Design a protein with these regions (language model features):
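Phosphate-group recognition and catalysis centered on beta-loop-alpha active-site segments
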Residues: 1-262
Length: 262
């Protein structure tokens, strides 16, 4: 029997392991680093400018520490003036395609209801750009919004059936009432209904949820499980040799690959 091989996705294109380049986060340098250490995928957050330009940025302000700068409110030209180090998506995809690694895309926007009612789907616009650069079989989308996962899966079924759409489960309950926080956590441990309604074909779960129940559940229903964010050495050792896990996302891809392949 072939040995099970858990895939490794470099969180933020390996930013934490590589460190800053020139005083700022450099996803292009991160892609090169992640490829050199043997990662299978690069994870990155995609945001949408007001003019429809897609950019790679973990933070809403592009990482400059100014809350008055909001990527979604600015055109690409305006963003360049305020946060000149933000990388356009197409530049990153060209660099990623040259390495042969896959793209793990975390959506940081959603299509407004009015736009969706008029027939627009920003997530489908993004998917259309992605498949121009990357083999659809090497694209994974993670999102926690049902309308987003449904529209992505519907589009992929027709245009890119190999693309994976994963429902993201887990996250902060900060600011919620106690009762709402309990309901949220319960729905994360027992997400069957939410998953069915999402039309997703994979699950992306926080490592605690994966270990408590979701690894067993996803194996039972036969869908891939992506686990985030797996950083400690002992946790990497455990999950990288768990046949129930499809992929882990980590800030330390070099160590993860060494533990898996060593």
């Amino acid at each position: 029997m072939a040995r099970h091989r858990v895939l490794v996705s470099a969180h933020r294109c390996g930013y934490a392991e590589l460190g800053t380049v020139g005083g700022h986060e450099d996803p292009l340098a991160g892609v090169m680093h992640s490829a050199q250490v043997g990662a299978d995928y690069c994870e990155f957050d995609v945001r949408r400018c007001a003019d429809g330009t897609f950019v790679v940025a973990h933070d809403p302000d592009g990482g400059i520490g100014d809350a008055s700068v909001v990527i979604s409110d600015l055109t690409w030209d305006q963003l360049c003036e305020s946060a000149p180090d933000v990388c356009r998506l197409d530049r990153l995809l060209d660099a990623l395609a040259a390495t042969g690694m896959g793209a793990h895309v975390d959506l940081k926007f959603r299509t407004p209801a009015a736009i969706r009612e008029a027939g627009g789907t920003w997530e489908v616009d993004l998917a259309s750009v992605m498949v121009e650069h990357i083999d659809p079989a090497k694209i994974v989308f993670t999102a926690g919004v049902r309308t987003t996962t449904m529209s992505l899966r519907a589009w992929a079924d027709e245009h890119a059936p190999g693309m994976v759409v994963a429902l993201s489960i887990g996250g902060s309950v900060r600011g919620m009432t106690w009762a709402n926080a309990v309901r949220r956590r319960w729905s994360e441990v027992f997400p069957q209904h939410r998953f069915r309604r999402s039309n997703s074909d994979a699950v992306a779960a926080h490592f605690v949820l994966a270990m408590v129940r979701l690894a067993r559940w996803t194996t039972h229903i036969g869908v891939p499980l992506l686990v985030w964010t797996v950083d400690s050495g002992w946790l990497q050792r455990r999950l990288l040799h768990d046949r129930r896990i499809w992929m882990i996302t980590t800030n330390h891809p070099a160590r993860a690959v060494a533990l898996r392949d060593g």
